[in-house]
């Protein structure tokens, strides 16, 4: 079971891969939203043993290219409301926010809600179903 937390921003993302009990599969690393780097990320995610789910927050439109790319590559992607992730895990007195910590928090959120994660469906796909 691999939870991939992706903290998305404009043109780049911070990635963290976690397993249950706080096991770090991959220390947080950054990728650009280029074809080459998304292809490398896809190859890496497919090489992981066990089931893998990618979790990211709705971030305006910035999440869409990476979510679509990974979904089209056959990887499970779940896009969640940022407020749910923000409220997850209690509050910290320090309130330190970094992309690395956010990616880890998103991955841990995914682990705790593994069974309930809804798979991402692009808007066009939803329109075709109507």
PLM regions: where:
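Phosphate- and other anionic-substrate recognition elements at nucleic-acid/protein interfaces
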Residues: 1-130
């Amino acid at each position: 079971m691999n939870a991939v937390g992706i903290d998305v921003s404009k043109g780049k993302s911070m990635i963290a891969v976690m397993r249950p009990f706080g096991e770090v599969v991959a220390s947080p690393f950054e990728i650009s939203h280029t074809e080459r780097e998304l292809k490398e990320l896809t190859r890496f995610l497919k090489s992981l043993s066990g089931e893998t789910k990618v979790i990211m927050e709705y971030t305006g439109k910035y999440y869409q290219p990476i979510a679509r790319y990974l979904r089209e590559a056959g990887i499970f992607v779940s896009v969640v409301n940022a407020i749910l992730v923000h409220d997850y895990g209690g509050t910290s007195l320090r309130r330190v926010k970094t992309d690395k910590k956010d990616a880890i928090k998103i991955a841990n959120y995914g682990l705790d809600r593994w069974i309930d994660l809804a798979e991402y469906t692009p808007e066009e796909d939803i329109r075709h179903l109507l």
